């Protein structure tokens, strides 16, 4: 499975990890996690450290994903940390961050990091992701 996720209810955190080749269709499919009421308002860490290849999405698809995500946001603010140690995923993450920030419906603050440790520090999580 290219994107695995785990829900940590104690920390109110969704931990997602990409593997292998990642496509935009898989990322859109992953958004179904956010339609689950029990994770409304949770923070999220999306780790792309193990992604070997990305089928580059168009700018329009990144905008569509950001709009879909913003429309699914809970009323309470939350945060999304994207971990992208390599340049292409980092750039795509920054594009997504920008589009999310431009959507007035968005209640989720997005930030992109090169390391899991920096992402966890920003999220305020004390434990590492295993």
Predicted regions and their residues:
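Amphipathic, Lys/Arg-enriched alpha-helical "gate/interface" segment within cytosolic domains
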Residues: 1-130
């Amino acid at each position: 499975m290219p994107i695995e996720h785990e829900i940590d209810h104690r920390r109110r955190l969704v931990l997602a990890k990409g593997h292998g080749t990642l496509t935009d269709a898989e990322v859109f499919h992953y958004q179904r996690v956010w339609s689950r009421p029990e994770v409304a308002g949770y923070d999220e860490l999306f780790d792309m450290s193990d992604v070997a290849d990305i089928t580059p999405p168009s700018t329009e698809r990144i905008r569509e994903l950001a709009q879909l995500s913003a429309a699914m946001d809970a009323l309470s603010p939350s945060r999304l940390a994207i971990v992208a140690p390599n340049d292409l995923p980092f750039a795509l993450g920054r594009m997504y961050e920008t589009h999310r920030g431009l959507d007035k419906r968005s209640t989720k603050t997005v930030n992109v990091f090169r390391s899991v440790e920096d992402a966890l520090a920003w999220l305020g999580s004390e434990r590492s992701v295993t």
